[in-house]
Amino acid sequence: MMIWVPALIFLSACLLPRSNGTPLEWDFAVTLRTKIQFLDSSWQTIATAAHEFDELSALTFDESEELIYFNDRQHQNGSIFSLRRDAYAASHVAQQAIQRTGNESVGGLAYDPLNRNLFWSDTLQRKIFFASIDSPPSQPPKVLVDLSQEGARPEGVAVDICRRKLYWTNSNITHPTVERIDVDGSNRVIIADSDIDMPKGIVVDQLSDRLFWIDDLKGVFFAVMSSNLDGSDRQVVLKDKHHEPQNLALTNDAIFWTDRTTKAVWSHPKRAAVKATTTVRPEVESSTDGTESESKQESEPVEDCPLVRVANLSEEARGIVARTGFYQRLQKDAHCSSIVRKIKLRLDEMSEKKEVRSLVDERMDQLERDHCMNGGSYISKRDLCICPAGFKGSRCEIRECHNYCVHGTCQMSDLAYPKCYCQPGFTGERCEVSNCAGLCLNGGHCRLGETEKDQPSCECPANFAGERCEQNSTQICSLFCRLLKHEPEIHVPFGCHDICEELALDNSTNIAIPQYQHLEVCQTPFVWTSSVIIILVVGIVFSLLLITTIIHGIRRLYKPKRPRIRKTFVVRKQPRTNSAGDTPLTNRPMTAEQCEITIENCCNMNICETPCFDPKLVEQTLAKSSCKEDKKILIHNMEDDLY
């Protein structure tokens, strides 16, 4: 018996749903008149269902249990039905959720996954009903809001599951409004009642905390409006014509709506095209005087974005829903995290099995738990994986940041969406756009700035100029040179002179060469000429002489002076006969015969400078003597001849 257990476990594991066969394979669902059409993210049809119905209209989606709820206006017994998309089933069985009670006409559907309640508007009875899907289908629904006495006409409905609010549109053309109320029926508030005509479908964007609704304007025009959840900061997302939109759906970055006229689904970016009106109501925020304050702001148009036709349908398009990844995206949201935990806890409780488990059942449970990868939670009753932030896929096997950023680093945002931080020189949602891509023309080289704020610049090749090297100087100059041939007085840019000369060599009949006055002045002079070199050398020499003079003067200024010695000698002009015994004391010469010699400091003393006679002996012995020896002998002879 034990031999069959592993085999049975292996067979059961092989029969588990594969990753490509789970309900996560579709991203959009659209109700046509006689069927529901499922489409993927590229708007390719995957499958169709609910072919047994004849007049489908509104629909809503329970993403927690993968259930679609829709309305059929002509069914005899039921009014609202549920359908589960099963990729392995040959057909999709729709079950009755709400029994028909009369001649009702459902305008809009909404679902609350926390309390498991359905909300819908009845355009004939002018009421908003709700009912629990856990109650028997035969149990009559309850009235949440009765608008019959006011003459209002409720159309679209939407549930804010995080803040526990219900929003609806009133398309009564005499007094159209957008209103909200708590899901328990209290605190009704009008959030918009001006500058609207006939609001239709409405949806709450939990990611941006904003409302979006369709307004069927007068004539052939329509608009998609947006505001905060309290009605403030109203904006016109788009305005166009020749559409008859009914319902809309949202993704992270786009709006989708169904058009009955063109039988198609259209899309537009979610950002606003014009900021319209900001309204703050007293119920939300009171002013100082306690009255309603309304401020009009000037329209601020942004870049126009055309509408995109994403899907052509075979029948009249009506309701539409989109998969938003609610449980993954809002796990960290301040308003939604507690609601997500409560819903997940309820799903876990529903998945618990109370019967006695065998060995095979326990092993099957282990296989089911291992079915979801990367920490995903497996909901066995619905065969569904709830993935943690950063992972997606039917088994949470795909990391959202894997290969997401082309030239950058990927991180998960607070809303569990991948976000790219680009490298310098790259931009785009996935850093896929280079700032230099296609910037420089004609072979120019792109240079990035030193900082992220600096714009890239182009280094242009010869004969090209401009911020993007888009100006071809050869072509421009050729036009001037051709025109100069016929109009000689025209001014030709200076840079065209050489180009015109080159063009004239090949086509001298049509090309004229401009003649500029004082052309040599405009040319770049040669700096190192002979005159410049001479002036430079002379300047250096004079500079050196000046420095030498200054240094010598400083030395003479600070050098001490030598003492000046002055001595006077008296001698005869002519020697006497027999004068060997004469001395200056015994025989002093007379005044007429004497001669005085003054010697200063012994430095200006020389035989040639002596005004008296020159002894013969000195002439003979000092003929070839040096200056110093000459001075010594002169002093010696003078001492001998003193009187």
Curated annotation (Swiss-Prot):
Which SMART domains does its entry note?
Answer: EGF, EGF_CA, LY
User: Do you know which InterPro entries this protein is assigned to?
Assistant: 6-blade_b-propeller_TolB-like, Cueball_EGF_LRP_Nidogen, EGF-like_Ca-bd_dom, EGF-like_dom, LDLR_classB_rpt
Q: Where in the numbering of this chain does the EGF-like domain appear?
A: 363-397, 398-429, 432-470
Parts of the chain on the Cytoplasmic side: 552-643
What's the superkingdom here?
Answer: Eukaryota
Query: Which is a Gene Ontology cellular component entry for this protein?
Result: plasma membrane
Similarity comment: Belongs to the cueball family.
Q: What is this protein called?
A: Protein cueball
Please give the organism. Drosophila ananassae (Fruit fly)
Taxonomic path: Eukaryota, Metazoa, Ecdysozoa, Arthropoda, Hexapoda
Q: Which gene encodes it?
A: cue
